């Protein structure tokens, strides 16, 4: 979970997991919740996710994007939490292939975060932008 001080850098969430009970499975995902909409960044984020997913299975990105969009939809606000991402659970097709996918999800998140933060970390922000961020952050809960 990344909640930066700089409102120009979006909040970003990532997790992966391997659940081991009588049945074993992988789950996880990542999503982005910007305070300030940046359509170029949104396109970049989704392109990177799609590229990574397609290395494993061309069906993953549309399936996991849809799952994320539904999972992070806020019905009480009638809006999505952010700009989406991917989300999956109960993934137990082939352990070795699933584990490679999980590792790529983590590596891709680290790469995306590094690129976004590097691009925006020294950008100044206004008081109004900070207020927008605080409002969005309060709605994140």
For each predicted feature, which ranges?
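A domain-level signal for the structural core that forms small-molecule/cofactor-binding pockets
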Residues: 1-141
